Regions:
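Bacterial N-terminal signal peptides
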Residues: 6-15
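Disordered inhibitory propeptide/activation segment of secreted metzincin zinc metalloprotease zymogens
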Residues: 16-95, 107, 155-165, 236
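A generic secondary-structure signal marking the coil-to-beta-strand transition
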Residues: 63-65, 130, 171, 206
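Active-site recognition of the HExxH zinc-binding catalytic motif
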Residues: 188-200
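Metalloprotease/metallohydrolase-associated module, dominated by Zn2+-dependent proteases
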Residues: 20-25, 157-185, 201-239
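Positively charged n-region of N-terminal signal peptides that target proteins for export
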Residues: 1-5, 100
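Metzincin-family zinc-dependent endopeptidase catalytic domain
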Residues: 97-191
Length: 239
């Protein structure tokens, strides 16, 4: 496979990029411009470096994370990091079931079936006005947030915290409440933000689920990249 061959040449480059030890690394997804990324760009090797490299170096979970669903809709405040206030709105049982299903399906695809399930799935109801941290050891915390689209022009944020060796220790998925509640494209949003929580960065040079604008399903490139990130021994051992 051409992409697997290209990966051998850039594994060493990715492994030498210094990791950022502190802070939660969030990435945003915006609405589609109607112009998909150019699949002919600099080649799959360059796109792979965008997706798996970056200033932090390659990052991944070493074991299946726990998934925590915030039943309470949270209030997004611009400039916030990992603490947010709960509203009195709640996700329905059907909303939660769909969200868990989409994230579980995405987990399998984006880890090349290394993790087919989260190690556990839990729900959390937060009293209105109470503060919640979305950065928690060994967990990916996911929920709907009021005001993301309105205040910062984004559909969602996905992020993670990692140690210097590239091991991800916490992840978070912040979904714009209105978009996630009403859009037929919400599964793409959820999958994209999960990708960030799993260690992936934005891809600009070709079409990918990790493009910074919403629009495409996981494709052959994404599946091959997941195989490299989670299954290729040389890459896994590079951190």
């Amino acid at each position: 496979m051409r992409l697997l061959t290209a990966s051998v040449a850039i594994i060493a480059v990715l492994a030498t990029v210094s990791a950022r030890p502190a802070g939660f690394d969030f990435h945003a997804l915006t609405e589609s411009s109607g112009r998909p990324a150019d699949s002919r760009g600099a080649g799959d090797g360059h796109a792979l470096q965008e997706m798996l490299g970056g200033s932090q170096g390659p990052q991944r979970w070493r074991q299946a994370p726990k998934l925590t669903i915030l039943v309470s809709v949270m209030e997004y405040e611009q400039g916030g990091d990992v603490e947010y206030l709960a509203t009195d709105e709640r996700l329905s049982d059907a909303d939660i079931a769909e969200l868990v299903r989409d994230l579980t399906d995405g987990l399998a695809v984006l880890t090349a079936n290394t993790f087919e399930q989260f190690s556990s799935v839990s729900r959390e109801i937060v009293a209105a006005g109470a503060t919640v941290r979305v950065s928690r050891p060994d967990q990916i915390v996911a929920g709907r947030f009021n005001g993301l689209r309105r205040s910062v022009k984004t559909l969602g944020f996905g992020g993670r915290r990692a140690r210097k060796d590239g091991t991800i220790t916490a992840g978070a998925i912040l979904l714009d409440s209105e978009f996630d509640r009403t859009s037929a494209s919400r599964r793409l949003l959820r999958t994209h933000e999960l990708g960030h929580a799993l260690g992936y960065n934005h891809v600009h040079s070709r079409t990918s689920i990790m493009n910074p604008r919403i629009g495409v399903e996981p494709n052959d490139f994404d599946r091959a990249a997941a195989l490299i990130a989670f299954r290729v021994p040389a890459f896994v051992a590079s951190r």
